[in-house]
């Protein structure tokens, strides 16, 4: 299985959460476009190797995706979940209320809940469920 915790699946930042959540995500400083361009060098940001959201997801393993309502990458996560489902990939989406990018640093009931959900998903994958 594949576990995607607040994934950066679209380096073009085309999802609306890059605008809507800029002032509420306490972990990420806003647009990461300069970093994305540096990382991509001369490649197109929408190339599937850089932004898997735009690629062929057929054959991906069962996937677990997580984000929070205050995460800059919320749109990435929701759109990636839909793209996986459209490609016929079993995928679960978990969105946590008020959670910023990366969660609450491991010290909250939400973080413990997330850890439990990831463990259950991994166990199910290992057991072939």
Where are these regions (language model features)?
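Alpha/beta-hydrolase superfamily serine-hydrolase fold, recognizing
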Residues: 1-129
């Amino acid at each position: 299985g594949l576990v995607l915790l607040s994934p950066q699946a679209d380096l073009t930042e085309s999802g609306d959460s890059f605008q809507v959540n800029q002032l509420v995500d306490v972990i990420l400083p806003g647009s990461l476009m300069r970093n994305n361009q540096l990382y991509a060098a001369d490649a197109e940001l929408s190339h599937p190797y850089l932004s898997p959201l735009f690629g062929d997801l057929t054959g991906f393993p069962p996937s677990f995706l997580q984000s929070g309502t205050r995460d800059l990458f919320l749109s990435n996560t929701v759109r990636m979940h839909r793209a996986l489902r459209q490609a016929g990939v079993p995928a679960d989406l978990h969105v946590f209320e008020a959670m910023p990018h990366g969660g609450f640093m491991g010290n909250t009931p939400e973080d413990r809940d997330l850890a439990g959900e990831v463990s259950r998903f991994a166990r199910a994958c290992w057991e072939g469920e």
